[in-house]
Amino acid sequence: MSTESTQSKACCNTPAVVAKGYQPKGDYIEVDGLKTYTTGPKDAKQGILVVYDIFGYFNQTLQGADILAYTDDQKYQVFMPDFFEGEPADISWMPPDTKEKEQKMGEFFKTKAAPPKTLPRIPKIVDELSQKNGIEKWAIIGFCWGGKIVNLSSMEGTKFKVAAACHPAMVAGDDAPGITIPYIMLPSGDESKDDVKKWQDGIKVPHVVEWFPDQIHGWMAARSDLEQEKVKSAYEKGYKMVLDFFKKHMGDGAKL
């Protein structure tokens, strides 16, 4: 079990979360041939790669990227590539409570969302952005499916200094021992307690696992209903915790 404090110390200047009609602060560029959302101060020397959930670009996820970029006193350039190239999963498939929805979701995970399709692109994206944007240190965060990609991108030889997985999908104990960087996981009430426990028992690096048992799978990304005060509060808390963890393990003076 991790003994690290998960309470937020920074982020006192958190901008108000917009429940509806959010206007993203960033722009779109092309990186490794992929449309990529970019936000944050252009002179920031630290970068965060965001691996979205299977539903792609949603305002809740874009707002999260802006929060990561501008909320903390440690500034970041933040990048969210469109790994599904304009063809994400349809959010109407959730929950997969019919045979048709289940089949569509399963097919998506076997094809476009198959990790071997995405994983090789990540080092290329980081290298290209490091060269073009002068970024010296990197963190990675992923949501749902993106959490699996983050886990598999945090092994030996990783280009990242610290990682975060929010309401991660496909949590597997076998993935934990190979992680080589500090790692924060924020499971929702929909994740398997057994799977997360096996994963936590296997991880050998500094880590935090903080449950949000009253939140659904997706509360920090596309499925977040920010018009509900309880969800909005958990959304804010989750991003604050991630930023604190990143700062602790990536900021000036961090011991890695």
Where are these regions (language model features)?
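N-terminal cap/leader regions of alpha/beta-hydrolase-fold enzymes
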Residues: M1-L256
